[in-house]
Amino acid sequence: MLFALGLLREEDRPGLIAELRATQGADGGWRVWYSGPPDLSTTVEAYYALRRLGVAADDPDLVSARAMVHRLGGADRTRFFTKLWLAVLGQYPWRHLPVLPPEMILLPDRAPLSPYRFGSWARGTFVALMIVLSRQPVYPQDVGMQELFTEAAGTNPAGEPKTPGRWTPLLTRAMGLAKLYTRRPFGPLRRLAEARVARWICERQEADGSWGGIQPPWIYSIFALHALGWPLDHPVLKRALDGFDDTFTVRDGDRLRIQACLSPIWDTCLAGVALADAGADEDDQDLRASAGWMLSK
């Protein structure tokens, strides 16, 4: 996001590099969780972030990361969200990504593809992506990453099922029709839908600038509104961007990172369950104190 919107502060560059280097495994890959296996998509994202931060391609850490990417199948086999980011940064063809026509916001609440058929945590991402996937913004970068692709970028389209199911032909045809409509939408209906999506997003922004207190809908909402032509100094976008600095940015010594979410109630609950499962007494003062704190919230 910082690269795309031109918001990277020069003083933050060393901290971001230090964080990425510190979390790289000895085998060159990055993990989704501690002690887990190297993850292809995470490794591709970290590699390109370091390249974009100014680390040379022949840096030993990037040489080992590149080798891991190729061992895991190459950037052409990354997940949908990684390819989405690469498309936004001009590193992957938008035509190989699925679309979500913003007109879906106009569906009745009980319709199968209505946003209200999704959980609240997914709904914000789903709605914001209606704009991002239809507007297909590109923020060209002066650093490429073609060395991570084992085939031409786009030969393994995002969203392609590993094992086709009985609904695959129907869904593939539906996506083809959606893409065809997205290329030539009905103007008045598209404008109505985009305005409805923008209003939906703005009405659900939290006081701290986030959407749902989690990173995905937050970032995609920023990109959605910006793709609609909203300037970064618009009050909604300014509040959203300021929120990253205020509550989500963590400085740990010489390292800098942005948290995926803030979840003290959730974390307290999970920690209490873990302690109980480990044999802690139900009358334990700490457990009772945490339960009381959760009830107070």
Predicted segments — roles?
Residues 1-297:
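Preference for long, amphipathic alpha-helical scaffolds in soluble/luminal domains
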